[in-house]
């Protein structure tokens, strides 16, 4: 037993005392009132006596619980035993001590017999003896445990001291090894001193809390002594000592913030600070050595490849320099830039030279290198057919002449009987092939004729014998001279009665075309396409000229040539008519034509037959391109799709940049555009043009641009080869434009969309009609012309003031006549002071429509009465006349 209330030790240690249950005694439970509405279950024993009489007031009783030893010390002494016939009942082990100390209440118990009291005293004495033995055993165990703990702590201290000594000596050994490697003596000796030689900071406490050994608190020895001294105290709860608070950290003490906690720092009782690591010491020594020896890093000069534009960040990466250094250099030059800013190649070259690098400048156009103008060896050259272009004025019989040579009828297939496409054909004469290119003669097809002249070897100038030299004839002569190709004059229509070939030769002299009959070198042949007269002579002249030119090409190389025409066919897709000038083109090859590329799916000749190859001077249709190239673009075969795609993307980007530059140059800023509209007042006629081939669209665009004036002009919103689609209608609706289809039609979706949007679609197959209709429509945008016709003058003799009418001028007509309702001007001292309309015109008292010269009349003006005698009235009529382009 003990006085400590906190002692949780149960006096009866879980062992149930063996008791002999007396006969005639029954146990039960009752609810005992605890007060304030609380109850508890109480075990009671009922004793039945053998006497025949029962006590009427007999009630169940409960065993008396053992009171605490501290409350009743007198009961701790054993009482003298009394004889009893049965053993005393033991207290229930499951009842806690608090319940034993609780005062009785609620139920009045009967007095126990002497034997029962004696038995209970014996049980209580035995329990007290067991408690004393248990307390003694626990005290012995506590002393033994403390002794073992002290021994373990002593061993840990010795081990920690040994490790601390090793850690303190290791930096000194390592520093000596590093010092031997350093050639020059350095003042780094102070850094290599062992940690044990460093003076401890004065402000550091001898045993800081942050470095205390694990499992051991400050003042533990004193606590151990205190526990030894109190070993004989009464048994109770072991009071744990509170950990000592860490001493306040002195100013400048880094504590645990410098690095991690190690065993060396934990047992460092002298308070020395944590030392620098070995790698840090090596870095410091190497840095000091370089500074002492003034060692400089070797500059590496690199070859920097510079495109046309480059960012500062990318330039610095190519030079292996820091972008900050490049920006500093630019700041010194007076330019404030960011790493992401673009600079041109000139500035980039200046920067690279400043940093000591060499520069190699490249251009985006380098992707096109090696695909054109590849030189061929002379022994690989073979003779090729001549390429002949037929040129001349419209309706002079160019296509008819070619039809007669080919024995075909192309004129019947052309709308209006005029050629609106470039046609490429190949004929054979005496076993030799000749390639013909037919060009349009209309004025709108100037670009086509120019392309035909550039891609040709010989130009045939067709001149009608009855029409002589015409404007497009002169233009064809100029194209041929600009291309540097020889000319053969074919004087056509000699079968007509009005034909005069000599007149043609004479007029050609004015344009520096000297035929052989006039002492020149130009061949001339009189032919008739209708009657097929002298066609063989013309072909012989062509072959003779080709022999003089000695035309050769290398067929055993990649193909190269010119796009003659391109169109978008519904069933075949993009189709380009090309003229192979060098090499041989075969299906499956990858070609680049303008800004389009593709793999050749099929080759079709001028007769509609599929061919397996196309050699030099052979015209073929190419299927398989990604889009329609522009007529006149050059094509070439490349080795891979990636190369073709790269070239195509580069050319498309160039085309976009040119279009943007053209728009920005013509449009400028918004203020400039508004100023231009206010000053010039130019009206635009928007159009969406779709044609069958690219060349026709180009001709239409050129013809419409020529119609523009200072007041109105045609603006082509979109143009392309192919049929009219729903997207074209949407574009026309957004831009309020009209749609023109040249030899193409709109599909059903486009027609339905145009009906819903109210967009007009006009179809044409002759360029004359298209240009005339657009010209008439553009004329409607012109403001009408104001024409003024002088009628006569009248002199004011007197001014009358009439009621309800106002001032009326009495006049005499001095010149011409005066009409009512016409425009009048009031002239005073030769200065026009008013211009308006004549309201009233009377002769005597009658209203008249006009007054002739020499007669007198009365006049009144509309909304004007400042008239005086002596003023002159000038009458005129204004007419508005519709203007045309």
UniProtKB/Swiss-Prot annotation:
One MF term in the entry's GO annotations: GTPase activity
Region (G5), start-end ranges: 528-530
Region (G1): 392-399
GO cellular component: cytosol
SUPFAM superfamilies (alphabetical): Initiation factor IF2/eIF5b, domain 3, P-loop containing nucleoside triphosphate hydrolases, Translation proteins
CDD domains: IF2_eIF5B (cd01887), IF2_mtIF2_II (cd03702), mtIF2_IVc (cd03692)
Domain tr-type G positions: 383-550
Biased composition (Low complexity): 63-77, 184-201
Biased segments, Pro residues type: 78-94
Gene3D superfamilies, alphabetized: P-loop containing nucleotide triphosphate hydrolases, Translation factors, Translation initiation factor IF- 2, domain 3
Start and end residues of each stretch annotated as G2: 417-421
Pfam families linked to this entry: EF-G_D2 (PF22042), GTP_EFTU (PF00009), GTP_EFTU_D2 (PF03144), IF-2 (PF11987), IF2_assoc (PF08364), IF2_N (PF04760)
Stretches for region G3: 438-441
Binding site for GTP: 392-399, 438-442, 492-495
UniProt region (Disordered), positions on chain: 1-295
Biased composition (Basic and acidic residues): 130-183
Region of interest: G4: 492-495
Function comment: One of the essential components for the initiation of protein synthesis. Protects formylmethionyl-tRNA from spontaneous hydrolysis and promotes its binding to the 30S ribosomal subunits. Also involved in the hydrolysis of GTP during the formation of the 70S ribosomal complex.
Membership in a protein family: Belongs to the TRAFAC class translation factor GTPase superfamily. Classic translation factor GTPase family. IF-2 subfamily.
Protein name: Translation initiation factor IF-2
Species of provenance: Sinorhizobium medicae (strain WSM419)
Lineage of source species: Bacteria, Pseudomonadati, Pseudomonadota, Alphaproteobacteria, Hyphomicrobiales
